[in-house]
Amino acid sequence: MVDDPFLFGKITANHCLNDIYAMGATPQTALAIVSVPFGLEEKVEDTLSQLLSGALEVLTAANTQLVGGHSAEGAELTLGFTVNGLIDREQVLTKDRLQPGQRLIITKAIGTGTLFAAEMRGKARGHWIAHATQSMLTSNRAAADCFKRHGATSCTDVTGFGVVGHVLEMLQPSHTELDLDVAALPLLQGATETIGAGITSSLHSRNLVRGEMIENYEAAASDPRIALMFDPQTAGGLIAGVPEDQA
């Protein structure tokens, strides 16, 4: 997604911390899984050092200790973290506790999937990618704390399933429906242009099957904002159900 291993480490750490924040928990420790492309020993060591330095910057800011992990050489650069956290059992935020009358709040603009697909094709503007990268580098920690203070009952993070997929994960167990104003969705700069040009990530077509769950989907499908609701996200935002008087 990004060529800079230091930034890649930061983005990956944010992405992995989101699962903890989405449950209302406080991260404690992390284990790394790293694969660095084959190369000269000095190059491999430098890439690994930059990856972990970026990740450690994010983890340290989250008061999370990197306690170990596993590294290897492989065909391509990969990085992931298993993050452990703590929470009071009575305060867990799950996906199945939406309540009628609540408002859904999303903490980040969407569009990383289509924007970086466009960047790979040489069809994205530099300031679009810079804006998207800054979004991915932004932690959801403060937003998660805000949700807890204002009575959120249900929460999820937006990743590969896109907004529609993750919202459906919240709606179906709760047996609730949602009135969604697409004009209120925050969008990353350039996302409507790239999705409107038909540039999508590899996961987008899989996500489109959930369109049948949306009323009047066929009539609105040509709107690029509708297409962006199926766009998979990396280090995306949180979506939480909050009482209307707290929203």
Protein language model regions, located:
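Helix-biased detector of long, well-ordered alpha-helical tracts
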Residues: 1-247
